[in-house]
């Protein structure tokens, strides 16, 4: 199985948003992508309230993004950190889209019955 890495760009926030992010990741997985969500991963071991750990999380997120082929924006509200991710993706030629955009692309790629 060879899946395209899809970076999930989402606001760092409250833990109640994590259920929504898990749902986004599941949908990407179901569409054939390998979802990578630093917000979910790093919240398990980094304390976003500590400036050094927050900055390390940002740096690690950007490093992960550089290895991905697609950036998926999973929020209507784009934070400053998300904007930086989108700009880096653009600079590196990484496709940036939304979950709806990924769904549309995936549906168009499916073979059509005649």
Please name every model-derived segment:
Residues 1-114:
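Conserved catalytic or regulatory cores that recognize and/or transform ribose-phosphate-containing ligands
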